């Protein structure tokens, strides 16, 4: 492969197996902002699904509109370019949702 081809070649996105979590805390603006930051810091995009609604990490309001409260079932689907980043994002969001509110 030529040097030019190596430079223009793009990596395939890594998509995780969706993770399922039962929320142990209510997701308000602070938590939604944290979820968006976690995904962006790891170079990933996440989609959260609750019931028939979904939200992505491009919109804080879409996450708020999921109305996640204690006991809400949430599916987290993350994709990114590096497996480690995808795993970190899933772990961080999962931890945030399963840590009870103070």
Place the predicted regions along the sequence by residue.
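N-terminal leader/presequence segments that are low-structure
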Residues: 2-8
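Short, conserved, surface-exposed binding loops centered on an aromatic residue
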Residues: 9-11, 38
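Short glycine-/aliphatic-rich beta-strand segments at the starts of folded cytosolic domains
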Residues: 13-23
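Generic detector of bulky aromatic hydrophobic side chains
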Residues: 17-19, 39, 53, 93-97
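Amphipathic alpha-helical interaction surfaces in cytosolic regulatory modules
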Residues: 25-47, 53-72, 86-89
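C-terminal structural segments of small proteins and small subunits
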Residues: 72-102
């Amino acid at each position: 492969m030529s040097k030019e081809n190596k430079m223009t070649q793009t990596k395939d996105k890594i998509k995780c197996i969706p993770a399922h979590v039962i929320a142990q805390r209510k997701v308000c603006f602070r938590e939604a902002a944290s979820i968006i930051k976690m995904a962006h810091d790891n170079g990933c995009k996440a989609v959260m699904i609750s019931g028939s609604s979904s939200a992505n990490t491009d919109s804080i309001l879409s996450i708020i509109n999921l109305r996640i409260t204690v006991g809400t079932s949430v599916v987290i689907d993350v994709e990114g370019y590096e497996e480690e980043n995808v795993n970190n994002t899933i772990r961080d969001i999962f931890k945030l949702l399963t840590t009870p509110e103070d």
